[in-house]
Every structure is written in C-alpha cells, then in structure tokens.
C-alpha cells in the first residue's frame, strides 16, 4: 500500500525546525507500518484508497495526515534516542545535549500519541457526521467501535 504522507511531510508536520530532523531520518517503511497499525484499522482500506486518490483532501490535510505524522514521530522516538551500528546499540548524546531519560521519553511519546489520537478521532467524528459524503468508510470496520485503550487500559 502506498503511504498517505512522505518523509518530507512527516518532518514538517511532526517535528519543529530546531529538532533538526531530515528526511533521511524518516524511513518510508516506518510510515507504512504506522499507517497499517494506527490508521487502517480505524478508517478501513477503502477509505485509505480514497484518500490516496486525492478524494477528501480537506479531511486528509487537516486531520488524517497530521495524525499519521505524529504517530510516526512517536514510533520513531526510541530509534532517534538510540543508534545501531557495527559496534552495537548506543545512546545518542554529545557535549551540548544530554539524552532524555526513559521517563522523559515515555512522557513525550505518550503526549505525542494523545495528540495524534485526538486528530484521528476528529477525522472519524467528521466522517461519521456525514456518512453520505464518505461512502468508502464502513463504521463496522472501525476498531474503536469494538475496542478502545485509554491510559493503557483496554475498555
């Protein structure tokens, strides 16, 4: 499946300029995994295909793509804090910056996931408020209608 957003879009939507994240830091495979893990189970394959065709550009630009970018950022955080090389795995640090603690990383990741989920919930609310406008969306396929996780608890 094609990605809804590019590494360039992830860099511009989910990271601040001072984060110094380049498109080389963002693997398209990570975006694809995030899209399959977080977006497809909510919106469904047919809706994703419609978004890829350019249908519903307003919905994609305002809610779905920013959510995908933030989910991608959250999934990238451990990889950004650690580097894998011939010598093994090492923590990123330099003389000017200290690496974040595990607690700080967890807190930032949780906050980023919450922002992404809020955007995706807004997209779903907009879609479900006008079902005739979005015929590709099948609410029965939305996993949030069957299972929800709030604060790490399955509801």
Whereabouts are the PLM-identified features?
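Amphipathic alpha-helical coiled-coil segments
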Residues: 103-123
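Eukaryote-specific, cytoplasm-facing alpha-helical/coiled-coil scaffolding segments in long proteins
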Residues: 94-105
